[in-house]
Amino acid sequence: MSEAFDFDTYIMAHYEKHPPLLHFAGESREEWYVWQQQLRARLLDLMEPFPEQVPLEARVVEHREQFGVHYEKVVYTTAEDVQVPAWLLIPEDVAQPAPGIICLHGHGIYGKDNVAHVDYGEEDRARAIERANYDYGLQLAKRGFVTLCPDARGFGERSEDFRRYGNRDGCNVNGIKTFLFGMNLMALNTWDDMRGLDYLASRPEVDADRLGCIGLSFGGTRSMYLAAVDERVKAADVVCYLTTFKQYALTQGNFCGSQFVPGILKYAEVADVCGLVAPRPLLIESGIQDGGFPIAAAREAYAHLESIYAAAQVSESLWRDEFDGGHQFSGAKAFDFFNAYL
């Protein structure tokens, strides 16, 4: 008898022996509907407790004009003792009220600034934006959408220094801190993003019935969870995130404490959570050279997602942009996608 010492061997054996309890396996619209109600309820249970809702008390603290777009730096309250700084980008010469899109950043110390293309003339910031084609908040604003680019907890202005833990992943440390209190950082960020939708909907420039979301990497994670639980999102773009927990969490370890809901794999794989967006339109972007989210796992997850949209009888609402690139925003289909559905 061989010794069972290795932890990774144990984890993978557990994964194979205990498939997710609510992994979608239906074919009919009726089966899809029942499954979706069950999984969304379970997901919300896992994400609780959410903070208590408080008045937004929003204020504008800065104005700037650049790239033919009006920028407002805004601050709004999402919970007790919690305020969110964000860039609001309002396109010039566009019919109002216009559709609004919350644009969510991924990992990195600059947070919202990259997505809004606010580089303060610094070369490091400019290179980070160019490398990932990161300024989709600006790109969408230049095409007629009002965009909101907020900082997540522990990023941008919401962290004294993202790198203060040395070689530790700051967002992982922050996630563990919330676990100590029986909270989880993914849920808290999702709550803040839901309040971001509240703020967008409150603006006179925005049509509250035409709201969307987009995010790259960790921003894609946020976009997925936001659209999964908040049906005000009428169209969602998940960029360079769709994968399997088996690949990116259990095999690669390419995740952190801010990127998952504790207990989720007991019930669902990544594509199942993404499937909660159905029947609403969903665009999945995947880079063929993305080492962090290998294309084989992305294709496996997308095939499962296709089965969910097919059962919901809305296959035409699931879009795919598999592009020849790495961990970055493609944009090849995103603008047509949002124009079609918002």
Q: What is the role of each PLM region?
A:
Residues G215-A227:
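Glycine-rich nucleophile elbow surrounding the catalytic serine of serine-hydrolase chemistry
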Residues V277, I284-S286:
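Short beta-strand/loop motif that positions the catalytic acidic residue
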Residues A303-L342:
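C-terminal catalytic histidine-bearing segment of alpha/beta-hydrolase fold enzymes
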